Amino acid sequence: LVKLDQSPYKEFFILKGGFLLSATYGLDVRATRDLDTTIRGFSLTEDKVKEICQFIEQPSANENFQFTVRKIKAIRNHFDYQGYNIKLHFQLGRGKFPIEIDLTTGEELLPISKTEDIPLLFSDRSVQFYVYPLKQIFADKLYIILVYAPFDFKISRLKNLFVIFFFSKLNN
């Protein structure tokens, strides 16, 4: 998030999914290694994704970490909207950690005007990003389970069902 916060693309990223729920509500039991985002404001092409990756890989002057892009893959072949999965290595000192970023576009969105303070994992700082409304996250997960699960069983994975369960407890 630090790199995206420093990027010229920051205003186009909308955070969503399990990472957002974990960061916002401190859901340690729903550990996630990927960052789900929706892009608005520009056309999401492979060239644009490569451009974003080049920025992410650039060393930061004041930071002691490095990102290396391992793979970029088109995703969402059965979906109504396109996307890309970026596999990265995050290197902090001698430790190397796999991270994934999913970039999607084209979803029908509720109005997005809210930013959220997202605490950073290896720092006492936080960054602000636009975020999906909770209703949008719930609707997306329910839609994915009901519509796409017949095509791909992995889509109805436990993590999507957990989000539905979480919302049922949140509203009690």
Region roles according to the model:
Residues L1-N172:
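Compositionally biased terminal segments of proteins
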